[in-house]
Design a protein with these regions (language model features):
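The conserved acidic donor/metal-binding loop of glycosyltransferases
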Residues: 1-4
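Conserved core of the sugar-phosphate nucleotidyltransferase
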Residues: 6-97
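Conserved beta-strand termini and adjacent loop/short-helix elements that scaffold enzyme active sites
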Residues: 31, 149-151, 206
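Short linear motifs in intrinsically disordered
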Residues: 37-42, 137, 204-207
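Short acidic-glycine loop/turn motifs at beta-strand connectors
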Residues: 52-57, 152, 218-222
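Conserved alpha/beta core of the MobA/IspD/sugar-nucleotide pyrophosphorylase nucleotidyltransferase superfamily
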Residues: 54, 61-186
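Conserved NTP-binding catalytic cores of kinases and kinase-like/nucleotidyltransferase enzymes
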Residues: 183-223
Length: 223
């Protein structure tokens, strides 16, 4: 919810899924970002570095959990900072913006039992069923192809609390340049997306959200 992927990136996913259907393999897509457009000045980040074949298809994603910004480029460490390996800022990484056909839900369900058995045994409190692990399984078994849709969009996210002012300024600039309206929807329009019963009564400010303001909306049951 705190990721901004860029408007063009969503269009790329939509356009791809609109004209591609599964054949003997699942036909998926993933937006690939330039690493330099996904980094923060405030600490290290985890990114999935993509291996892409000559046809623009994803071969694999290698997760590096400690990547730091170095000018327009970056470097990662796997030994708690004792040594670093350089990475070009143009390296393509996954930010988990995927496009799937509906059959992917069945594949998620298929692997969940094995994940749960292993996770509960080895790390019951923190085990996570990572979406890319399902993609990797399908690639390894030759059941899927993933087209990498390259973008120069800048990704914004709040990895560290110090990132928040920069992200807010970036969103404000998008508004000023008319990429988005200053108010995406009214409070009542937002409330209409939820299944509230009754008659709208009022809304009042309710603290500050992570990026956006939050409100408490009150509805009364009809008598």
């Amino acid at each position: 919810a705190d990721d901004y992927y860029g408007r063009e990136a969503f269009k790329q996913i939509y356009d791809y899924l609109s004209v591609h259907e599964d054949n003997d393999k699942y036909q998926y897509a993933m937006v690939g970002y330039q690493l330099k457009n996904t980094l923060t000045e405030n600490g290290s980040v985890a990114r999935g570095v993509c291996d892409i074949d000559s046809n623009g298809k994803l071969v694999s994603v290698t997760e590096h959990t400690t990547i730091v910004k170095r000018g327009e480029n970056a470097a990662y460490t796997e030994d708690d900072g004792k040594s670093y390996t350089d990475l070009s800022g143009d390296t393509i990484v996954s930010m988990n913006l995927w496009g799937f056909s509906k059959g992917f839900l069945s594949e998620i369900a298929y692997g969940f039992r094995d994940f749960l058995q292993e996770g509960l045994q080895h790390n019951p409190l923190k085990c996570e069923y990572y979406l890319p692990s399902v993609v990797s399984r399908l690639l390894d078994s030759n059941k899927a192809e993933v087209k990498v849709l390259l973008t120069t969009e800048k990704w914004y996210g709040v990895t560290y609390k110090e990132d928040k002012p920069m992200v807010m300024a970036a969103v404000k600039k998008l508004e000023e340049n008319d990429f988005y309206p200053k108010q995406l929807c009214g409070k009542l329009e937002a409330a209409a997306n939820f299944c509230f019963e009754g008659v709208y009564k009022e809304e009042i400010p309710w603290g500050n959200g992570h990026i956006n303001d939050t409100y408490r909306v009150t509805f009364e049951n009809e008598q």
